Amino acid sequence: MGVWLHFGYVRRRKLYILDSMIKTAYTCFSTDVIHEGHLNIIKEGKKYGRLIVGVLSDKAKVRSDRFPVIPFEERFEMIKNIDGVDEVVEQNNVLYDEVINSIKPDYVVHGDNWNEYPDSIIKENVIKNLSKYGGELIEIPYTYNAKVLKINSIMREKLAMPEYRRKRLRQLLNLCPIVKVIEAHSGISGLIAEKTIVERNGELDQFDAMWVSSLCDSTAKGKPDIELVDISSRMRTLDDILDVTTKPIILDGDTGGQAEHFAYNVRTLERMGISAVIIEDKIGLKRNSLFGTEVEQTQDTIEAFCNKIKAGKEALRTEEFMVIARIESLILEQGMEDALKRAFAYVEAGADGIMIHSRRKTPDEVFEFCDKFRQREKQTPIVVVPTSYSQVTENELVQHGINIVIYANHLTRSAFPAMKNTAVEILKNHRAKEVENNIMPFNEIIKLIDEL
């Protein structure tokens, strides 16, 4: 009996030693569809030992990559069922610190298509973490062929389709602590919103959605912001942006016009794939809210504005499009109680979100509104536009229950001074050499604009 115990111990000891000698390889996928490039990485990775594949979480994917067409759970199962994969784990950050420190793989296997910013940040992060214990990076030549490129193109085009884009704002509200929205007023500004990714404090980040502002749309056309640019022209701008981007769009709907007209416009926006429209509770000639009481502005009655909200909601054919009510009580100095009274009434009428606006230089009254609103209404999204109180951080907004922050006019306001300065310098110097260092190189323009 003792001999058998001895042999059993020896056998287990040998297996333990063999297990400890087996190398571990790790790779991570964020893809929604497996093509031969991924299969090649799995095949090559398997040569180095036991292969663990990380699947990037939905929350991490929206910070650094395209929005997931397939949810994490389905992507996890898809990878799990591929031959050659020994284990599948969730990767919760696009950078590898956490997963490498946890698994300590002998090798990280990746395609060689990550040498340009921002992907180069991920590569540097992997090398840094592997160097801590002598791990090795294995780069596999990326599979460039017509089939792979076609699959990538189809997945991008799928994200741009109305039925996928329209619902994405609601999905982002469930994934992100705060949805970050940047203004776009043309196809090129839409591409900037779409493609800008930064690295900060060890994380990659990007904007989640785009805001098509009536102010910026009017300014780009050289017209005043008084609803002079009609809805047909606004929709042409939307179409230009929709044509070259995939991110969800929120439209600045001004007052929404007549309730009967608003219903038809909502139906059109929903069909186009717009995610939301924000309408303000004012009537009469539209004037920019940041003028406040310096110009004549008239607030709509609660009853009439509720009827407009209801008209828009009743026109919808899906539950994906959002009608968001913008409250002007603080702008027009009608007081906090009026703002809250309106907010609760608008939610009762069917508003999918509340935007509270202020022209104060500090966020105090906005925070007071949000705190009081949240005491009673826990779920309805709150939207803010911190144009006048720009010092506030997104983390501060989250602490007060705010769900969406819109940087409403900043691409327009930064573009025009740059263009004016270029014009001045050329006139002053009678040549263009002096502006060369301040303008975009041609190769960057080419990279920004996608070809079919």
Residue ranges of model-derived segments:
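Short, basic, helix/turn surface patches
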Residues: 81-83, 112-125, 136-142, 237-243, ...
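Extended, intrinsically disordered, low-complexity segments
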Residues: 159-169, 188, 410-452
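Short gly/pro/ser/thr-enriched loop/turn and capping motifs at secondary-structure boundaries
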Residues: 59-61, 115-117, 145-146, 217-219, ...
